[in-house]
């Protein structure tokens, strides 16, 4: 009886979380069927998931396609490991940053947009901006 009550409570809590516009996940097993029908599609260069500073859970902000939420289990989509992800393959989609004084990532409200890729980032964002800690030393970074 206690086990079935735990299952019922878990289902209820998951349903409540997933009815918000963005949702938090503790692992990489994301399925587009978990999302509400009105969950937004990602915009150009928008980060699809970013780790919450409060909980360390990934907060998913948008879906990459009708069938894909956000490829958080693939390092080739990681802007910053275990912290930020983009729908596209990082190395083939983003140019390397060339100046550490220009923001690599800009955030407004709850939308993170990446302009270029760095080797390492000054994370978390300060004042809505993330700068490179070190510039990309090679054209294609291998994970």
From Swiss-Prot:
Reported modifications of this chain: Contains 4 disulfide bonds.
GO cellular component term of the entry, any: extracellular region
Keyword field: Disulfide bond, Neurotoxin, Secreted, Signal, Toxin
Domain of life, per lineage: Eukaryota
Localisation: Secreted
Signal peptide positions on this chain: 1-23
GO molecular function terms noted in the UniProt entry: toxin activity
Propeptide regions on this chain: 24-32
This protein's record includes keyword Signal: yes
Tissue expr: Expressed by the venom duct.
Domain notes: The cysteine framework is VIII (C-C-C-C-C-C-C-C-C-C).
Protein name: Turripeptide VIII-01
């Amino acid at each position: 009886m206690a086990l079935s009550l735990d299952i019922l409570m878990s289902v209820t809590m998951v349903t409540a979380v997933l009815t918000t516009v963005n949702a938090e996940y503790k692992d990489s097993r994301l399925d587009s069927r978990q999302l509400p029908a009105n969950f937004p599609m990602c915009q150009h260069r928008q980060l699809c998931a970013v780790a919450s500073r409060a909980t360390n859970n990934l907060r998913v902000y948008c879906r990459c396609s009708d069938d894909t939420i956000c490829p958080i289990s693939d390092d080739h989509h990681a802007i910053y490991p275990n912290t930020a992800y983009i729908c596209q393959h990082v190395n083939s989609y983003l140019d390397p940053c060339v100046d550490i004084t220009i923001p690599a990532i800009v955030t407004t409200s709850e939308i993170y947009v990446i302009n270029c890729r760095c080797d390492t980032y000054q994370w978390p964002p300060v004042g809505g901006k993330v700068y490179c800690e070190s510039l990309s030393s090679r054209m294609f970074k291998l994970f």
